[in-house]
From Swiss-Prot:
Family per record: Belongs to the class-I aminoacyl-tRNA synthetase family.
Gene from which the chain derives: argS
Name of the protein described by the UniProt record: Arginine--tRNA ligase
GO biological process, any: arginyl-tRNA aminoacylation
GO molecular-function term, one example from the UniProt record: ATP binding
Species in which this protein is naturally found: Campylobacter lari (strain RM2100 / D67 / ATCC BAA-1060)
GO CC terms in record: cytoplasm
Length: 531
């Protein structure tokens, strides 16, 4: 809708301009401050320029009114224009709020948790944000691929193998074992150990077989992780292995050296990242000749940045904040534009249950598992919660608040609007097809506001994607549901003279809720549990 209005105005004025969304929709649906930017150029009073703009635009069919106010030009859309948009949306509902295919392409790498155990609630936040970003981007016409970087090398994988071996010895072979200071613990380790004991012969469980056991356990853990993600309706396009990049390490080091990106000191190879704004230089090859985690990660990012995507996006935990400068420095040394590597940080999550800290999982020791919270709340509610606040802000929520069946629970409140609309159609004995060509002739201001917001979904999605502020989608839905409930409570629908008109209004509202929820990975309810 906003795009159509912009094109209409640009055609008449012959220039680009800013089109704003005023908060008071009773005053205007859109406004432009163009007169202020032209005032310097034309050396005229912006009030006079605004009046000239009004004269040029007042005959546009899409506007009910075009008015100048304090230098701004305000536009109110006509019922006929909004009606045509609503009819088009309902007749082609599959494509509502979609955008034309865009040339810009993205590669999103997210989750990428070590394959040493199930996902915890911190992983879940980045996972749900990343999946929602993907859904919205694809809906808006972007090429948007997704990837999970599997850290299947290094000490943590050896520790996994050792932890499984010790658990087999203790719980299956009934031996006395001495656990090291660092190892993986929890019921999930014991469960996998029992699977390993059933898979291999008894004499397999010796120290020299730890590497083989570790690789076997890593695959088991990845299956658990993929199941955690699937339970939250998250499916990642590709899983790429850290070890698969080792053969490229030498070439990458050579390229870094050629561009002045590394130097040797104290028997180590250092990335000269401080030259590019990092707080200090970083070791990438240790004095034993082995690469650090950063070294492997540089190789992986070099590959990603060389695949032809316009932008590579990473979602990292907030504890990786200090990692951004060194990775961008490495990419710059390798000849890539670091502006094309975007890092989104997922902040910490604090869970409460009835006002008290949520209990840690017995299965994982000192973590709250994603699977446990999914089991308690369900995927739809958890997804809503994690999208409801900007990803880089701390999130605290009480699971019991989202079990309430009243307006204090936004998931319930929005679903109730959608279900109510289905009930009204059932009560009227009509379908969307029956009312698709009804005309909006008698809508009051509340009805017009509901209609405008229902048709404004695409603009909300574009704004949410471009600003990476996905919380704008649930904010939009809460407002839309509020507008609907207000109109529903104050107007008779079934049996009124305006029945078809109101039903058409409700149909476009329900369509917006359904699509916005689907892009959040949530299924809109047609019927509430108590109905």
């Amino acid at each position: 809708m906003k795009t159509l209005v912009y094109k209409e105005i640009k055609e008449k004025l012959g220039r680009d301009f800013i089109l704003e969304n005023p908060k008071n929709k009773n005053l205007a649906h859109f406004a432009t401050p163009l007169a202020f930017s032209l005032a310097k150029e034309l050396k005229q009073n912006p009030m006079i320029i605004a009046n000239d703009i009004v004269v040029k635009l007042k005959d546009c069919d899409c506007f009910e009114s075009v008015e100048a106010l304090n230098g701004y030009v305000n536009f109110k859309l006509s019922k006929a224009f909004l009606n045509s948009l609503a009819t088009q949306a309902l007749s082609d509902s599959e494509n509502f709020a979609k955008d034309d295919k865009k040339e810009q392409s993205f590669l999103l790498e997210y989750v990428s948790a070590n394959p040493t155990g199930p996902l915890h609630i911190g992983h879940a936040r980045g996972a749900i944000f990343g999946d929602t970003l993907t859904r919205v981007a694809r809906h808006l016409g972007y090429k948007f691929d997704t990837e999970y970087y599997v850290n299947d090398a290094g000490n943590q994988i050896y520790l996994l193998g050792l932890s499984i071996l010790l658990a087999v010895k203790e719980h299956c072979l009934k031996e006395q074992v001495q656990y090291p200071d660092e190892y993986y613990k929890g019921e999930y380790i014991i469960d996998v150990a029992k699977e390993a004991f059933a898979e291999f012969e008894k004499d397999f469980f010796v120290e020299e077989n730890i590497p083989q056991l570790a690789l076997w356990a890593k695959d088991k853990m990845l299956k658990i992780i993929k199941q955690n993600l699937a339970d939250a309706k998250i499916f990642i396009d590709a899983y790429v292995s850290e070890t698969s990049y080792y053969s490229e390490l030498e070439n990458t080091l050579k390229a870094l050296k050629e561009h002045g990106g590394t130097y040797e000191q104290d028997g180590k190879i250092w990335l000269a990242s401080s030259v590019k704004g990092d707080e200090k230089d970083r070791v990438i090859i240790k004095d034993d000749g082995k690469g650090t985690y950063l070294a492997a990660d540089i190789v992986y990012h070099k590959d990603k940045m060389s695949r032809g995507y316009d932008k590579c996006i990473n979602i990292w935990g907030a504890d990786h904040h200090g990692y951004i400068a060194r990775m961008k420095a490495a990419m710059e040394f390798l000849g890539h534009d670091s502006q094309n590597l975007e890092i989104i940080l997922a902040q910490m999550v604090s869970l409460l249950k009835n006002g008290e800290p949520y209990k840690m999982s017995k299965r994982a020791g000192n973590f709250i598992l994603m699977g446990d919270v999914l089991e308690e709340l369900g995927s739809d509610v958890l997804r809503y919660i994690f999208i409801s606040k900007k990803c880089d802000t701390h999130l605290e929520f009480d699971v019991d608040e989202f079990k309430k069946e009243d307006s204090s629970n936004p998931v319930y409140y929005i679903n109730y609007a959608h279900a109510r609309i289905h009930q009204v159609f059932a009560k009227a004995g009509k379908s969307v097809d029956d009312v698709m060509y009804a005309k909006f002739e008698s809508l009051n201001e509340d009805g017009m506001n509901l209609l405008f917001e229902s048709l404004n979904l695409k603009a909300v999605l574009n704004d949410a994607f471009e600003s990476r502020s996905l919380q704008k989608i649930p904010d939009y839905l809460k407002n839309l549901a509020s507008l609907f409930h207000k109109f529903y409570n104050e107007n008779k629908v079934v049996g009124s003279d305006n029945e078809d008109e109101f039903l058409k209004l409700f149909a476009i509202c329900a369509l917006s809720i359904k699509i916005a929820f689907a892009l959040m990975g949530i299924e809109a309810k047609n019927k509430m549990n108590h109905d």
